[in-house]
Protein backbone atom coordinates (compact mmCIF):
# COMPACT_ATOMS: atom_id res chain seq x y z
CA UNK A 1 0.00 0.00 0.00
CA UNK A 2 3.04 2.32 0.06
CA UNK A 3 5.06 1.80 -3.14
CA UNK A 4 8.50 3.30 -3.62
CA UNK A 5 8.87 5.33 -6.83
CA UNK A 6 11.75 6.47 -8.98
CA UNK A 7 12.33 10.24 -9.11
CA UNK A 8 11.18 13.06 -6.83
CA UNK A 9 8.08 15.19 -7.31
CA UNK A 10 6.65 18.65 -6.66
CA UNK A 11 3.54 19.16 -4.53
CA UNK A 12 1.42 19.21 -7.70
CA UNK A 13 2.81 15.75 -8.62
CA UNK A 14 4.93 17.06 -11.50
CA UNK A 15 8.38 15.53 -11.70
CA UNK A 16 11.10 17.38 -9.81
CA UNK A 17 14.24 15.35 -10.53
CA UNK A 18 16.19 12.17 -9.83
CA UNK A 19 15.83 10.37 -6.52
CA UNK A 20 13.32 8.22 -4.65
CA UNK A 21 9.81 9.01 -3.41
CA UNK A 22 6.95 7.12 -1.80
CA UNK A 23 3.21 7.20 -2.34
CA UNK A 24 0.45 5.77 -0.14
CA UNK A 25 -2.86 4.22 -1.03
CA UNK A 26 -5.88 6.32 -0.04
CA UNK A 27 -9.65 5.88 -0.26
CA UNK A 28 -9.68 7.80 -3.54
CA UNK A 29 -6.47 6.53 -5.15
CA UNK A 30 -2.86 7.44 -4.34
CA UNK A 31 -1.27 10.26 -2.37
CA UNK A 32 1.15 12.78 -3.86
CA UNK A 33 4.60 11.12 -3.69
CA UNK A 34 6.67 12.12 -0.66
CA UNK A 35 10.33 12.67 -1.51
CA UNK A 36 12.73 10.47 0.47
CA UNK A 37 15.96 12.00 1.77
CA UNK A 38 18.73 9.43 1.26
CA UNK A 39 22.32 10.34 2.11
CA UNK A 40 24.49 10.57 -1.02
CA UNK A 41 21.93 8.83 -3.21
CA UNK A 42 22.75 8.51 -6.89
CA UNK A 43 22.25 5.89 -9.59
CA UNK A 44 24.35 5.60 -12.73
CA UNK A 45 21.89 3.24 -14.41
CA UNK A 46 18.68 4.23 -16.17
CA UNK A 47 16.81 1.58 -14.19
CA UNK A 48 16.30 1.24 -10.43
CA UNK A 49 14.24 -0.97 -8.17
CA UNK A 50 13.45 -0.54 -4.49
CA UNK A 51 11.95 -2.71 -1.77
CA UNK A 52 11.01 -1.75 1.78
CA UNK A 53 10.98 -4.14 4.73
CA UNK A 54 7.76 -5.07 6.50
CA UNK A 55 8.52 -2.65 9.36
CA UNK A 56 9.44 0.08 6.81
CA UNK A 57 12.84 0.66 8.44
CA UNK A 58 15.03 -1.05 5.83
CA UNK A 59 15.20 -0.21 2.13
CA UNK A 60 16.86 -2.32 -0.55
CA UNK A 61 17.95 -0.96 -3.92
CA UNK A 62 19.05 -2.38 -7.26
CA UNK A 63 21.17 0.50 -8.58
CA UNK A 64 24.57 1.16 -10.13
CA UNK A 65 27.13 3.21 -8.18
CA UNK A 66 30.87 3.80 -8.13
CA UNK A 67 31.47 0.74 -5.90
CA UNK A 68 29.27 -1.63 -7.92
CA UNK A 69 30.91 -4.89 -9.00
CA UNK A 70 29.30 -4.83 -12.43
CA UNK A 71 26.12 -3.19 -13.67
CA UNK A 72 23.42 -2.82 -11.03
CA UNK A 73 24.18 -4.21 -7.56
CA UNK A 74 22.03 -4.71 -4.49
CA UNK A 75 22.32 -2.07 -1.75
CA UNK A 76 20.76 -1.55 1.69
CA UNK A 77 19.79 1.64 3.54
CA UNK A 78 18.39 2.14 7.04
CA UNK A 79 15.82 4.60 8.36
CA UNK A 80 17.27 7.21 10.73
CA UNK A 81 15.43 8.80 13.70
CA UNK A 82 14.87 12.02 11.73
CA UNK A 83 13.04 10.15 8.95
CA UNK A 84 15.89 10.26 6.43
CA UNK A 85 17.87 7.25 5.19
CA UNK A 86 21.51 6.22 5.48
CA UNK A 87 23.75 6.14 2.43
CA UNK A 88 23.12 2.98 0.37
CA UNK A 89 25.60 0.25 1.34
CA UNK A 90 26.72 -2.37 -1.16
CA UNK A 91 25.52 -5.79 0.01
CA UNK A 92 28.74 -7.49 -1.04
CA UNK A 93 30.14 -10.10 -3.39
CA UNK A 94 28.15 -12.92 -1.77
CA UNK A 95 25.12 -11.71 -3.76
CA UNK A 96 26.44 -9.22 -6.34
CA UNK A 97 28.17 -10.31 -9.56
CA UNK A 98 29.95 -8.62 -12.44
CA UNK A 99 26.69 -8.39 -14.42
CA UNK A 100 23.22 -7.24 -13.33
CA UNK A 101 21.27 -7.88 -10.13
CA UNK A 102 17.74 -6.57 -9.70
CA UNK A 103 14.31 -6.71 -8.05
CA UNK A 104 15.34 -7.34 -4.41
CA UNK A 105 12.61 -8.54 -2.07
CA UNK A 106 13.21 -8.93 1.67
CA UNK A 107 11.12 -11.50 3.53
CA UNK A 108 9.19 -10.55 6.65
CA UNK A 109 11.97 -12.13 8.75
CA UNK A 110 14.43 -9.45 7.50
CA UNK A 111 16.87 -12.30 6.71
CA UNK A 112 15.57 -14.03 3.60
CA UNK A 113 16.40 -12.21 0.37
CA UNK A 114 14.98 -12.94 -3.06
CA UNK A 115 16.49 -11.25 -6.10
CA UNK A 116 17.02 -11.65 -9.83
CA UNK A 117 20.44 -12.02 -11.40
CA UNK A 118 22.05 -12.47 -14.79
CA UNK A 119 25.37 -13.37 -13.18
CA UNK A 120 24.65 -16.52 -11.16
CA UNK A 121 24.16 -19.83 -13.08
CA UNK A 122 20.58 -20.19 -14.24
CA UNK A 123 18.06 -21.44 -16.78
CA UNK A 124 17.59 -18.22 -18.76
CA UNK A 125 19.01 -14.74 -19.20
CA UNK A 126 17.84 -13.67 -15.72
CA UNK A 127 16.73 -16.00 -12.93
CA UNK A 128 15.37 -15.60 -9.40
CA UNK A 129 17.52 -16.65 -6.43
CA UNK A 130 17.13 -16.98 -2.66
CA UNK A 131 19.78 -16.32 -0.01
CA UNK A 132 19.88 -15.87 3.78
CA UNK A 133 21.58 -13.05 5.66
CA UNK A 134 24.21 -14.50 8.02
CA UNK A 135 24.97 -11.48 10.24
CA UNK A 136 24.24 -7.81 10.81
CA UNK A 137 26.71 -6.15 8.43
CA UNK A 138 24.37 -7.04 5.53
CA UNK A 139 27.39 -8.12 3.46
CA UNK A 140 27.56 -11.81 4.46
CA UNK A 141 25.03 -14.12 2.80
CA UNK A 142 24.54 -17.81 2.20
CA UNK A 143 25.32 -19.10 -1.30
CA UNK A 144 22.47 -17.86 -3.55
CA UNK A 145 20.23 -20.79 -4.52
CA UNK A 146 18.45 -20.86 -7.87
CA UNK A 147 14.69 -21.19 -7.33
CA UNK A 148 14.58 -23.93 -9.95
CA UNK A 149 12.76 -24.58 -13.26
CA UNK A 150 9.31 -24.47 -11.66
CA UNK A 151 9.79 -20.71 -11.21
CA UNK A 152 12.61 -19.85 -13.62
CA UNK A 153 12.14 -20.17 -17.37
CA UNK A 154 14.55 -20.26 -20.35
CA UNK A 155 13.80 -16.54 -20.77
CA UNK A 156 13.58 -13.66 -18.25
CA UNK A 157 12.23 -13.96 -14.69
CA UNK A 158 12.10 -11.26 -12.01
CA UNK A 159 10.00 -9.23 -9.53
CA UNK A 160 9.44 -12.04 -7.06
CA UNK A 161 7.10 -10.88 -4.28
CA UNK A 162 5.57 -12.74 -1.34
CA UNK A 163 3.13 -11.79 1.40
CA UNK A 164 3.71 -12.00 5.16
CA UNK A 165 2.11 -15.48 5.23
CA UNK A 166 4.91 -16.79 3.00
CA UNK A 167 2.64 -19.37 1.35
CA UNK A 168 2.81 -18.11 -2.23
CA UNK A 169 4.63 -15.65 -4.44
CA UNK A 170 3.86 -13.51 -7.47
CA UNK A 171 6.54 -13.52 -10.16
CA UNK A 172 6.97 -11.87 -13.57
CA UNK A 173 8.13 -14.31 -16.23
CA UNK A 174 8.71 -14.33 -19.98
CA UNK A 175 7.88 -17.66 -21.59
CA UNK A 176 9.28 -18.60 -25.03
CA UNK A 177 7.36 -16.80 -27.76
CA UNK A 178 5.36 -14.60 -25.36
CA UNK A 179 5.74 -11.35 -23.46
CA UNK A 180 6.04 -11.03 -19.69
CA UNK A 181 3.10 -12.15 -17.54
CA UNK A 182 2.46 -12.42 -13.80
CA UNK A 183 2.23 -15.87 -12.24
CA UNK A 184 1.22 -17.14 -8.80
CA UNK A 185 3.40 -19.92 -7.39
CA UNK A 186 3.05 -21.86 -4.15
CA UNK A 187 6.22 -22.19 -2.12
CA UNK A 188 7.92 -25.28 -0.73
CA UNK A 189 9.28 -25.00 2.80
CA UNK A 190 12.83 -24.50 1.51
CA UNK A 191 11.79 -21.35 -0.36
CA UNK A 192 9.91 -19.68 2.49
CA UNK A 193 11.27 -16.97 4.82
CA UNK A 194 11.55 -17.80 8.51
CA UNK A 195 8.20 -17.60 10.29
CA UNK A 196 7.46 -14.36 12.13
CA UNK A 197 4.61 -13.11 14.29
CA UNK A 198 3.24 -9.68 13.45
CA UNK A 199 1.43 -8.04 16.38
CA UNK A 200 -0.50 -4.79 16.06
CA UNK A 201 -1.46 -2.60 19.00
CA UNK A 202 -0.43 0.26 21.28
CA UNK A 203 1.79 0.19 24.37
CA UNK A 204 0.84 3.01 26.74
CA UNK A 205 2.64 4.60 29.65
CA UNK A 206 0.80 3.51 32.80
CA UNK A 207 0.78 7.03 34.26
CA UNK A 208 0.44 9.37 31.29
CA UNK A 209 -1.51 6.96 29.05
CA UNK A 210 0.66 8.21 26.18
CA UNK A 211 2.03 5.79 23.55
CA UNK A 212 5.54 4.43 24.15
CA UNK A 213 7.78 4.26 21.10
CA UNK A 214 9.80 1.06 20.80
CA UNK A 215 11.31 -1.30 18.26
CA UNK A 216 9.65 -4.66 17.78
CA UNK A 217 11.62 -7.62 19.10
CA UNK A 218 12.05 -10.78 17.06
Task: Please give the residue ranges for each predicted region.
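Short, conserved micro-motifs composed of acidic
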Residues: 1-202, 206-213
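Short amphipathic beta-strand segments in non-cytosolic proteins
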Residues: 215-218
Amino acid sequence: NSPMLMNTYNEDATQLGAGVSQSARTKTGWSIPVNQKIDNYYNRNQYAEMNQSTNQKIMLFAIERSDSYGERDLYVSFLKPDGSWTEPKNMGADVNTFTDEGAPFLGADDRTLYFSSAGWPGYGNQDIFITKRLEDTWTKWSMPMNMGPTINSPEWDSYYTIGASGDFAIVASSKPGTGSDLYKVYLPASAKPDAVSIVYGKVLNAKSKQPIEADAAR
